[in-house]
Amino acid sequence: MSAATKKIETFFTIDMPYRERMEIRRTVFVGGDAPRVAVVAGVHGDELEGLYVCHRLAVWLDELQRTSPDSLLGNIELYPAINTLGLDTLTRGLPVFDTDLNRAFPGSAGGPLPERLAAALMTALSGSALVVDIHASNIYLREIPQVRINQEFDDLLVPIARRMNLDLIWLHGAATVLETTVAHSLNSCGTPCLVAEMGVGMRITPHYCDQLVAGILNVWKDLGVLAPDVSVPEASHVPLIADDSNVHYLNAQTSGMFIPAASHWTDVRCGEVLGTIVSPFQGDILSEVRSPVDGVLFTLREYPLVYEGSLMARVMGRKGGRS
């Protein structure tokens, strides 16, 4: 078997109005004939966690090529910046088209730019042994590292997700799943795709990223992409399981400033004050935010200003403490 190589490829290109040309690239680590896997990031332009994960994976793979090039048995593709225009402008969607790119799949090769890009990505990813689509939260909320799975595909994906070294597996019912996402489109056509979400928009949380990197490397080793004797970081996190029946949404009862009283990713008790909503114009507390159940606080508001109905937290109800 020949030693592993690395190359940068352009998988999508289109002419822009002012004699410019947009090119979307991927980094490919070429090994042997074992399975092909991929990591996708930057579908939303305000989500940067996945870009750093791709960097950390590239660092690890560069070192593997230097020290043990024969240990890469398959091919690894990193797609760190799908929505380049959104990333350039700190815009969640695709600028000009005002489109959420993750609502354009599976796309159309003859459609407008969002659909063409979606179709090109589908073509590039189809047939992979596993795709990991990495997202951050928006700028308003902080999420613990988690995998989100449509229950339609849970038999296939949950066993893989358990090895991803994340803290939560959130199973979504079919009624709450958007079918125009890259993950749903890939899973529907037989290419396994996990959605990982963590952190907060427009920020990087390095320890979350390293946690996910360890999980991805362990899964790649399980799939035979990496040699059995390769040393990978320990995957020490055991995920909790959440579904639509035990996830509780806490929405603001009034507008104001949300001041958290509980720490993110901690055990909370039923009735415990998780935060308060106050007014900058007076000294009164406008509203207390209390946990409806015993559970774990896995989503917490990062941006303090809230309107009535704004999401402030999510609690996963369960018995006992967090292990």
Language model features by range: what are they?
Residues 1-323:
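Structured catalytic-domain cores with a bias toward divalent-metal coordination
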